[in-house]
Regions:
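Glycine-/proline-rich flexible loop or hinge segments
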Residues: 34-41, 57-62
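Glycine-rich phosphate-binding segment of PLP-dependent enzymes
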Residues: 47-66, 80
Length: 388
């Protein structure tokens, strides 16, 4: 019998599936097992050298104390400049700097979602959207894009049927985790029309904005007419700049929202790490070439994987951005993933964790050699074509 009485809200939430698989892979590796880890959403590149130097310089200059809670002025202004370049009308006062993108999402949900409030998700959806909704006391309505190859445009009628005047928040993620699709302007305009018609606030998670394939350009939802005052834009430094462990993210929206969210921020994390924020300024201002090189490498891997899977009898929708691929697997995707890691020693994440059973998410943030090794192992255990 437990000594503790846990809250209902925590009881509604399951541990992160992505972190659970990552921990299992690490445990096997500690026993000497060679695991090809395709579960983790982490670039396999090092942080750009100039960003690391900026952090060192900030440390040497004594930038180790508290900062203003919303972030240092230089970083907030650099973020605002980036957002304005994306077509959003934001000043530095509209920006909250957070220790990671998850914290940004948490603060927004805690500020906007109360007991019983409705949040609409577009499946497959990143695992933490559901958890953040439940932690805030909200309820979920979900729209599945799987029948449309994970493209939102085909699912707009379904989304229209799901979103109503009772929908308090709609979450849009493009390029998407776990599917890698980049939503078209027509799809985003459809979201805009629904949001305006139902007076619904939209969270636009743009964490993978700079990792797009085939020369695509991603439209920021908040730049569309009618969306500036009803969109909260989330972004961060983990993926594009290979800064996962630095824990630096941000959100931007109407000043009133940022001010209210500041209460959650101030009473939970106080501020993001001082010297890391200075490194963030350097990342925004002087890493275009490094970011482009990483994005190009991800695109080459995408091309190799999609072609290799086709050669082995598996057709998959080609990801348009980010660095994830949804592989069709057995109906019981969780059992498939357990077999994959337990027998083939390949770590993946079950699609059911994202609201899409029958699939496994593979991250191609790994070397081409290791990715092909993973396919060989899965094929040797009759797992690669299990969902065909």
């Amino acid at each position: 019998m437990s000594l503790f009485e846990f809250t209902d809200r925590v009881g509604r939430v399951s541990p992160s599936a992505t972190l659970a698989i990552c921990n299992e892979a690490s445990a096997l590796e500690s026993q000497g097992v060679d695991v090809v880890d395709l579960s983790v959403g982490e670039p396999d590149f090092d942080t750009p050298e100039n960003v690391k130097r900026a952090a060192h310089d900030a440390l040497d200059a004594g930038k180790t104390g508290y900062t203003p809670s919303p972030g240092i002025p230089a970083l907030r202004e650099a973020i605002a400049e980036k957002l304005r370049a994306d077509g959003l009308d934001h000043d530095a006062e509209d920006v909250m700097v957070t220790p990671g993108g998850k914290q940004a999402l948490y603060e927004v949900f805690q500020t906007l979602i109360g007991e019983g409030d409705e949040v609409a998700l577009i499946d497959p959806a990143w695992v933490s959207y559901e958890a953040m909704t439940k932690l805030a006391g909200g309820s979920l309505t979900r729209v599945d894009t799987t029948p449309y190859g994970f493209h939102l445009e085909g699912a707009l009628d379904d989304l229209q049927a799901a979103v109503s005047d009772d929908t308090d928040l709609l979450v849009v993620n493009s390029p998407g985790n776990p599917h890698g699709m980049v939503y078209t302007d027509a799809a985003l305009e459809g979201v805009r029309d629904l949001a305006v018609d139902h007076d619904t606030t939209v969270v636009s998670d743009e964490l993978y904005q700079q990792i797009v394939h085939d020369g695509r350009e991603m439209t920021s939802l908040g730049s569309l007419s009618g969306m500036g005052d009803r969109t909260i834009t989330l972004n961060g430094f983990s993926k594009a700049y290979a800064m996962t462990g630095w824990r630096l993210g941000y959100f931007a929206g109407p000043a009133e929202l940022v001010s209210e969210a500041g209460k959650v921020h101030g009473h939970s994390v106080s501020c993001a790490t001082n010297f890391v924020q200075h490194a963030g300024v350097e990342a925004l201002r002087n890493t275009d070439e490094a970011v482009a090189e990483m994005a190009a490498a991800f695109e080459r891997r995408r091309d190799t994987l999609v072609a290799e899977l086709a050669d082995r009898g598996v057709d998959v929708p080609a990801p348009e951005g980010a660095f994830y691929l949804m592989l069709p697997v057995a109906e019981d995707d969780q059992a498939w993933c357990e077999t994959a890691i337990g027998e083939a020693h390949v770590a993946t994440v079950p699609g059911s964790a994202f609201g899409t059973p029958g699939y496994a998410r593979l991250s191609y943030a790994n070397s081409t050699e290791r990715l092909l090794e993973a396919f060989d192992r899965l094929e040797a255990h009759d797992l690669l074509t299990a969902g065909v």
